[in-house]
Swiss-Prot record:
Name of this protein: Ribosome maturation factor RimM
Molecular-function GO terms, alphabetical: ribosome binding
Family: Belongs to the RimM family.
Primary gene name: rimM
Keyword Cytoplasm belongs to the record: yes
Positions of transmembrane segments: none
Gene3D superfamilies attached to this UniProt entry: PRC-barrel domain, RimM
Length: 173
């Protein structure tokens, strides 16, 4: 398991006083205000969210040490991480996306498909990205039907390839 987990990404500046748009990756967006110190990926900068309000599908937040629009603009695109021990424990069948990255992906017969490269959400649900050793990346819906088994301790996810892309249907060019 990873020692730190990405919980938010700083977006565009908001207003003139250093507020930023904050895209959170937590079930409860406001939870980032309770985690204490958030750091950049390299750990070089630390921030605390001192104030946040929900606007549409993001937060408008005030971060410690960011007081001008120019400072806020320079942070656009910065990912913010929190120490794993600050996060709540997961329930049975739940996990943090960070725990999936790097797991082996195998089909239901145990044949290797590749490695979990990322989990995406483009608005219509989670997508699991599998990077095979050779060939194109697989982007599959992260549903119980397609990913019936997530075995963090065993270091693998089991993929039930959807019929539309499993290669069993002939090309119709």
């Amino acid at each position: 398991m990873t020692a730190r987990v990405c919980v938010a990404r700083i977006g565009a500046a908001h207003g003139l006083r250093g507020e930023v748009r904050l895209w959170t990756f937590t079930e409860d967006p406001i939870a980032v205000t309770r985690y204490g110190s958030l750091s950049t990926k390299d750990g070089a900068r630390q921030f605390e969210v001192t104030h946040a309000r929900e606007v549409k599908d993001y937060l408008v937040a005030t971060l410690t040490g960011v007081t001008t629009r120019e400072e806020a603009e320079r942070l656009n695109g910065t990912d913010l991480y929190v120490a794993r021990d600050k996060l709540p424990a997961t329930d049975e069948g739940e996990f943090y996306h960070a725990d999936l990255i790097g797991l082996a992906a195998v089909d239901v017969a145990g044949k290797p498909l590749g490695t979990v490269a990322a989990i995406h959400n483009f608005g219509a649900g989670d997508i699991i990205e599998i990077a095979p050793a050779h060939g194109p990346t697989l982007m599959l819906p992260f549903t119980d039907a397609v990913v019936p088994t997530v075995d963090i301790a065993g270091g693998r996810v089991v993929i039930e390839m959807p019929g539309e892309i499993d290669g069993d249907t002939p090309d119709q060019a």
